[in-house]
Amino acid sequence: MVPDLNTPGRDSPRHEWFGEQIQYRAKLRRFSKAPPEITVQQVSFERDFQRYRNAYDRGQTSCFNRPRTGRPATDAPRSDESLERSQRRAKTGVRLLVTELAPTALVTFTTRETMPLDDLLKVWQRFCALMRQAGIDFEYVAVPERHPTNPSHFHLHVAYRGRTKFDNMRRFWHMALEARHGRRVFIVLRGVESPGNVDVQRIKSRCAISAIRKIARYISKYITKDMISEFNRKRYWPSKGITLIEAERFWLSGLTQLEAIKEACQMFGLWHEGVDFCPQKIWMPGERFAYIVVDPSLLPPAPF
């Protein structure tokens, strides 16, 4: 699936703004181990003009430079709009990182003891150090979840990529939990002695792509507004080395959402010309955005 990069003018609007104040742009997000995602976005000159006008009224030299008022105090109240923006950014960040990771398993780490989130993070860091010391190479994206009946209790949902015996993970998890109290253990503790559990759901290769996307959506839903409001910091912990490929953007000629979607599908080789239809799943939450998640099994046949 190769975009039509040779078409001139795709890096700038296809129509003059004074003639067409509503235009569309396609964003291509590639992943190294999963099919890409495509967003068709409406761009409004009127909204942009209002942004420039507001910046001018505030005496700013650019509409992209917000006045800096210093770092807000961690206990400073935040508006609902600010919390919702933070939540959306964090959810999107988690979903993209998990998709790029292409995990081989979804692992849930639980603790018998109730502990603050800071302590849980230290236990997790200790667990990761033990895994590295044992020569186990792995990558992850971890998101804490507040227990539904005990808000002070947390456990971790982890998108995991690597090869290891999961009994080793349980042993290292118990070692990290017990080390918090200065106790040294070298085996998996059972029954009432167990300080926590590790639940593993492996991803089957025959449905890997759909499972990866499902895990990405599942983990990102635990980025909640109350967690953002309470902790006011990063709400997920990715391992080093997970790098997102920079998104590519292409301006479209279509002047309606349906025209723009068809043009984007044709540009990226998703349109089935024989039946004049795109078999890919397209989600349109409103007139400003449309999302296309590519399923390779639904690509149109080669034209030869």
Describe each region flagged by the PLM:
Residues 156-158:
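Long, low-complexity, serine/threonine/proline-rich intrinsically disordered regulatory regions
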Residues 1-152, 161-304:
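Right-hand nucleic-acid polymerase module
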